[in-house]
Amino acid sequence: MSDINATRLPAWLVDCPCVGDDVNRLLTRGE
């Protein structure tokens, strides 16, 4: 499921800008 989530990340990120903003910060900090 983690692999699928990673592949779908960009897809749902664009679909959910509200949640994407929060995840974007996590990704930026992670990388």
Curated annotation (Swiss-Prot):
Which species does the entry assign this protein to? Amanita bisporigera (Destroying angel)
Q: What is this protein called?
A: Phallacidin proprotein 1
Please give the Gene Ontology molecular function terms for this protein. Answer: toxin activity
Keywords carried by this UniProt record: Thioether bond, Toxin
| Function in brief | Major toxin that belongs to the bicyclic heptapeptides called phallotoxins. Although structurally related to amatoxins, phallotoxins have a different mode of action, which is the stabilization of F-actin. Phallotoxins are poisonous when administered parenterally, but not orally because of poor absorption.
- Report residue numbers covered by any propeptide: 1-10, 18-31
Q: From the record heading this protein, give the residue positions of the covalent cross-link 2'-cysteinyl-6'-hydroxytryptophan sulfoxide (Trp-Cys).
A: W12-C16
Record location of the Cyclopeptide (Ala-Pro) cross-link: A11-P17
Question: Which modifications occur after translation, per UniProt?
Answer: Processed by the macrocyclase-peptidase enzyme POPB to yield a toxic cyclic heptapeptide. POPB first removes 10 residues from the N-terminus. Conformational trapping of the remaining peptide forces the enzyme to release this intermediate rather than proceed to macrocyclization. The enzyme rebinds the remaining peptide in a different conformation and catalyzes macrocyclization of the N-terminal 7 residues.
This chain is encoded by the gene named: PHA1_2
Family, according to the entry, reads as follows: Belongs to the MSDIN fungal toxin family.
